[in-house]
Design a protein with these regions (language model features):
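Disordered, acidic interdomain junction associated with two-component signaling
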Residues: 1-17, 54, 104
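Alpha4 helix (beta4-alpha4-beta5 surface) of REC/receiver domains from two-component response regulators
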Residues: 2, 75-76, 83, 87, ...
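The feature encodes the CheY-like receiver
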Residues: 26, 70, 98
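Residue-level signal for the "D+5" position in two-component response regulator receiver
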Residues: 42, 69-72, 83
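Acidic catalytic/metal-coordinating carboxylates
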Residues: 45-48, 73-77
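Active-site residues of response regulator receiver
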Residues: 66
């Protein structure tokens, strides 16, 4: 049943940049997305995320962005990505509630919110929803 859902939920093929400072979350999210058929780039901080996005933006269909990162906040990274490409699709991921800063980022045009921790089904549904 889970396999049927995965195939139905994801057409795969798109490329996603995952930005998170926790190595375990990066690796697990990368593997989950790859199992759904996506190509995945990863970045552990804001500078790395912006560098990867600038280099690969023509290939990147979606950015999954952690809201709380050391050095550069998710909000600042979101704004920087939008300066590079105003049409970039961004899915905000956070262990914090949608209230406060996340709500402000969504109001500025972020494409969705994914509460952490998330399951494969939730990830697949939310990614597909934003990509469609």
């Amino acid at each position: 049943m889970q396999k049927a859902f995965e195939n139905k939920a994801s057409n795969g093929g798109e490329t996603i940049l995952v930005v998170d400072d926790e190595k375990m979350i990066l690796e697990v999210t990368k593997e989950l997305l790859k199992s759904l058929g996506y190509q995945v780039y990863i970045a552990q901080n804001g500078k790395e995320a912006i560098d990867v996005f600038m280099e690969k933006q023509s290939q990147i269909n979606l950015v999954i962005l952690d809201m709380v990162l050391p050095g550069m906040s998710g909000s600042k990274i979101f704004d920087s990505l939008r300066e590079i490409n105003p049409d970039v699709r961004v899915l905000l991921a956070s262990g914090y509630s949608i209230n406060g800063e996340a709500e402000q980022i969504l109001a500025r045009g972020c494409n969705g919110f994914l509460p952490k921790p998330f399951r494969l089904r939730e990830l697949a549904q939310k990614v597909r929803e934003v990509l469609n």
